Amino acid sequence: MKRYIYNILILLSVGLLFSCQSSHKKLLNSNNNDAKYEAAVKAYEKGDYYKANQLFENLILYFRGKDKAEDVNMYYGKSLMEDGQYYVAGYQFENFVRWFPYSPKAEEALYLSAYCKYKESPDFYLDQTLTQESIKAFKDYIAKYPESPRVQEANKCLDELRMKLIQKDYTQAYNYYKVGQYQAAQTALKGFINKYADQTKYRQDAMYYIVLADYHFAMGSVEEKKKERWNNMILDYERYQALFENFTDKTKIEDLKSKYEFAKKELENLK
């Protein structure tokens, strides 16, 4: 008996699903655009964003130039965004700003176009073109609406996006050290420090690996180059020590200190 009831419930659920799908398809193909609009808004409010964006997309041409045009276009962009279709949603919000530049919703649309790019921004080790586009979009938004309450959130997103670029640049510079290209590591890590002087954490790591790269580079040098390169290592170590001695774990400090003492002995032997 229980199995029979269970099977009946399954059949009813499947039937209801097909009925809903059939009703949605009929509505999409109908000419009753007011009913379609009401159904689209209800679907959006219920969180059925896929159905909502299908219906709103279907309504854009019909409502062009009419009172509901702004609402339809804004709902369409938001339903795409909520459905996770950030690339298409961002494009729709950009269109909204172009089509309705004087709308009260234009500010929100400009912010959401930047936000959609932010959501599309990949992990730091991948290509960062979208990250850079999102940074530009948020900067443009802040420049245009500096008093907006959304500026605080925009700045948070900007900080996160910039950190991705910093991580990528640091990782690329560090990778030269990792593969034993010590001269290239020195150049890349020093370039990183100059570019991001305000980034204490990565600056500390970069300077640590500069000293290590100096050490390995000097160790592998021909005799006539060793004096210059040991001197460079000593100078870089002393800069590191002055800035970060109290902020570095003891293992790293002891490791660098032993290499520093070795460098001084090598210089004494070269006199």
Question: Residue locations for each model-derived region?
Answer:
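Sec-dependent bacterial lipoprotein signal peptides
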Residues: 1-20
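Acidic, polar-rich low-complexity tracts and alpha-helical solenoid repeat scaffolds
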Residues: 5, 19-271
